[in-house]
């Protein structure tokens, strides 16, 4: 009696087998989800010919070029190979069109199907020589380089000839002289300005050997210190207003780092900008006003007025091809990595290759193309300089240095 009520083992197995056969189509359609891991990626690149770092549809960018390379080597699953957002690809620092990077750090999710050093080699074989991947390493799944980055360090290589005092008998020298006398003939100047050609507006000695005098160098060093600390940089970007809280930025250091003489006997000054974060065009506009103040001998205290006045100053942007992202800083995040036994974000193992890349693909071409690019020539078109001169005059009521100090800076007798 009990044996009849108890189902046999054979009948139970047979029922399971029938159920599996009935749903064999459903089970065959199930695939194992590929395993992905968050990694950080250390890269260097030359920004010439690219529309910046950030991915932008139908535009050639650094991030898109890297993403396509990762997809081609099989580091990205096929269904995610149409957008970097699907693999959470982001960078520690953003660079604008034409700006280079000695070191930048990206975060992205890649398939855990091959060793990361092997992926680096495969990607570098596909990438153009102006973009290099130096290292990939596993990190936290929540890693976002833009968020955990403490600060960014940029460098700007300024040709010393761009700091040359305007030549006598030029319109620019005439405007400066009249302003120093507190007589500013705007109507007369504008009538002359309309008849100027490009050659008349450009300092013709940009490519000639020129050495920065000690008074000019001291003035430039002092002007750089005015940027340190927390200020409103609304006049140094195109996207923020005076009342916008995000226009307040903290700069840890702005300084003159060193002087360099290239193979054509031209002197360059290296400026360092170290801050928590920077806005669009901020550094290039900071360099632009530093050039103007050093050339004209304007009181460096005027920089404080650009921070504290709601009026937006029309500052011309210095050329982009002389701006380099030196490195992002991850000091706080690396301390966290040591506590949780994760590899810190560092690239000492590739430092030799990075230095060689920076010399061969960034600084040397930058020095060589200085004359042919004509970027500084267009920067010195008097129309742009005249607008800046007007705006500074409105802020300061022509608050120049004392005549004796001004003569020392300008090299006048």
Curated annotation (Swiss-Prot):
Its EC number is 5.4.99.-. Keywords: Cytoplasm, Isomerase, Lyase, Nucleus, tRNA processing. This is Putative tRNA pseudouridine synthase C16C4.06c. It is found in: Cytoplasm; Nucleus. It comes from the Eukaryota. One of its GO terms (biological process) is mRNA pseudouridine synthesis. GO terms for molecular function: lyase activity; pseudouridine synthase activity; RNA binding; tRNA pseudouridine synthase activity. Belongs to the tRNA pseudouridine synthase TruA family. InterPro entries: PsdUridine_synth_cat_dom_sf, PsdUridine_synth_TruA, PsdUridine_synth_TruA_a/b_dom, PsdUridine_synth_TruA_C, PUS1/PUS2-like, TruA/RsuA/RluB/E/F_N. Substrate binds at residue 154. It catalyses: a uridine in tRNA = a pseudouridine in tRNA. GO terms for cellular component: cytoplasm; nucleus. Disulfide bonds: none annotated. NCBIfam families: hisT_truA. Its main location: cytoplasm. The active site is at residue 96.
